[in-house]
Amino acid sequence: LSGGMKQKLALSCALIHKPKLLILDEPTTGVDPVSRREFWEMLQNLKNEGITILVSTAYMDEAGLCDTIALILNGEFLKIDTPKNIVQQFEPEIFSVQSNQRSKLLTDLRRLPEVSSCYAFGDSIHVTVENKKISEEELQNFLLKNGHEQIEIAKIEPTVEDCFMELSKQQEENN
C-alpha cells in the first residue's frame, strides 16, 4: 500500500469503535498531495458527523483547514485562535517577490534594514515589512540596483505560515 492508502486504512481502523475524539499525529507526513487532499476531505466529513479531531501537523496549509489552531514553537504556544483571526491580526505588510536569481534575491532582501523577515515560499520569496517602511517601487529599485532582472513584486495577504514565521521570529528575539 502507498503511504496515503496506509493512512486512510489506519483512519478507518481508528473509527471502528465510533470515537467522539480522534487524535492524529502528523497523519499526512510523507503522503502525496492527492492522498493528502482526500485524507482531509475524510476528516471534514468526520467533523460534520460530530467527531472532535485533534491534529498535529507541520503543514500550515493543513492547519488553516482547522476550526482552531495552536501555533507552537519549541513547546511554547505562540498563539491560539481561528486561522482567520490569526491572519487578520497580522499587521506587517507582506510582499511576494520573484527574480531570475532566487538565491541572490534571498540574500539581498535580508540585507535590507526595512525587512523584518524573508523566506522562500513556493516559487517566490515572502518578505515581511514592519510599519510600511518600504514601498513596492523602492523594493523594485533596490533589486534593480543589485543586478536582478525579471522582477515580480506583489503585495499579498498573509497566510497562516506567514503569521507563524513572524511569531517565531518575535519569540526568538524575546528569548
Model-identified regions with their sequence ranges:
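Hydrophobic anchor residue at the start of the ABC signature
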Residues: 11
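Conserved catalytic motifs of ABC-family nucleotide-binding domains
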Residues: 18
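Catalytic Walker B motif of ABC-type/P-loop ATPase nucleotide-binding domains
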Residues: 22-25
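Helical segment within the ABC ATPase nucleotide-binding domain
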Residues: 37-49
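Conserved ABC ATPase "signature" C-loop
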Residues: 75-76
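ABC ATPase "signature
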Residues: 80-81
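Short, charged/small-residue-rich alpha-helical element at the C-terminal edge
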Residues: 91-170
